[in-house]
Regions:
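Juxtamembrane helix-capping/reentrant segments at transmembrane boundaries
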Residues: 40-48, 75-92, 155-160
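Hydrophobic transmembrane alpha-helices
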Residues: 19-20, 24-27, 47, 56, ...
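Membrane-interface helix termini and inter-helical loops of multi-pass transporters
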Residues: 31-43, 72-77, 105-117
Length: 263
């Protein structure tokens, strides 16, 4: 693979943006550090705030989904180097999420507010959700997910390692560990306001729809192997421990391919 300086710089900028908006989103939902958070003092009328927030959420969802479609990727690949296709996706997603965080309008009353040990539990779950979501990006190859591998920062993956369905590690517990972590992070809070509730509901709904599309693609790719995996492992919520031997042991040597939904 040719390592072109322009490709390396642009992909590094996209990854840096990914890192910044991830930390920014954590602070946004936690209500710390950043000037505008998911809940806060009203800045405009409730109707206007709800309309703006819904528009921002829809804009992000459309961008995140449409740019992941094969037709759009094919169109884009005819106009930019193939090594930068993923980088452009990450970069545009960074910008759209940053716009949401900057333009978000807090509104409404507080839904719940807990303190003491319950608040500690809520914050612990919030942190655990983000740790799970971020850890899951490395389970599917973080460098490829953010476009660094394609741009030349690391060796290209061996195509032979992407032919099997990976069901080890976090994927032996739930089929979509990244989404499990995000949903947990969206809902685990000691202070839930109306605008936070809107964000959590919309984001969770988008994840649910995205999972359906992703699983359709995975079934088309892996066929009966994925059907068997889906029958044994839940999508988002881990099952209670079951008797040893009732689930096939995964082959830990099999590595996953970054899935469409992570796009």
């Amino acid at each position: 693979m040719t390592r072109r300086p322009a490709h390396l710089l642009l992909s590094a900028a996209a990854w840096l943006g990914f890192f910044v908006v991830t930390v920014w989103t954590i602070a946004f939902l936690a209500g710390v550090v950043v000037p505008r958070t998911v809940d806060g003092p009203d800045r405009t009328t409730t109707a206007r705030a709800v309309a703006i927030d819904l528009a921002l959420l829809l804009f992000f969802a459309v961008q995140h989904s449409v740019m992941a479609r094969r037709q759009v990727k094919s169109w884009l690949s005819r106009r930019i180097p193939a090594a930068l296709e993923r980088t452009y996706y990450v970069l545009v997603t960074d910008i759209c999420l940053a716009l949401l965080l900057v333009l978000w309008q807090p509104w409404g009353e507080q839904i719940w507010h807990v303190e003491g040990p319950v608040a500690v539990i809520a914050w612990s779950l919030f942190a655990a959700g983000w740790v799970l979501a971020i850890t899951a990006t490395f389970a599917v190859d973080h460098l490829e997910l953010v476009g660094l591998r394609q741009a030349g920062w690391a060796a290209a993956r061996d195509p032979g390692l992407t032919t099997d369905l990976y069901v080890g590690g976090l994927y032996a517990v739930v089929r979509h560990p990244m989404m499990t972590g995000l949903v947990l992070a969206f809902w685990a809070t000691p202070r839930m306001g109306a605008s936070h509730l809107l964000f959590a509901l919309a984001a969770t709904g988008y994840i649910a729809v995205g999972i359906r599309f992703e699983e359709r693609d995975l079934r088309n790719t892996f066929g009966a192997s994925y059907d068997d995996y889906a029958a044994r492992v839940p999508a988002l919520l881990p099952r209670l421990p079951i008797r040893r031997g009732s689930v096939h042991s995964p082959d830990p040597s099999r590595r996953p391919t970054p899935q469409r939904w992570t796009r």
